[in-house]
Amino acid sequence: MAAKKSFIIKQKLAKAKNQNRPLPQWYRLKTNNKIRYNAKRRHWRRTKLGL
């Protein structure tokens, strides 16, 4: 990644960073909750963003 990034690229990186986190524990404790984990987690080395 270049040191000089355009603002659009920086925004996309920030969004990807925010999306790449586990589910909050309080959300798992909700009644009738079927979701156990974040299926869209991304590992920095395995899957690239394709920017």
Curated annotation (Swiss-Prot):
GO biological process, one term: translation
PROSITE patterns to which the protein is assigned, alphabetical: RIBOSOMAL_L39E
Any one Gene Ontology cellular component term annotated for this protein: cytosolic large ribosomal subunit
Molecular functions per Gene Ontology: structural constituent of ribosome
Pfam families: Ribosomal_L39
Keyword field: Ribonucleoprotein, Ribosomal protein
Subunit architecture: Interacts with YIH1.
Homology family: Belongs to the eukaryotic ribosomal protein eL39 family.
Name of protein: Large ribosomal subunit protein eL39
Gene: RPL39
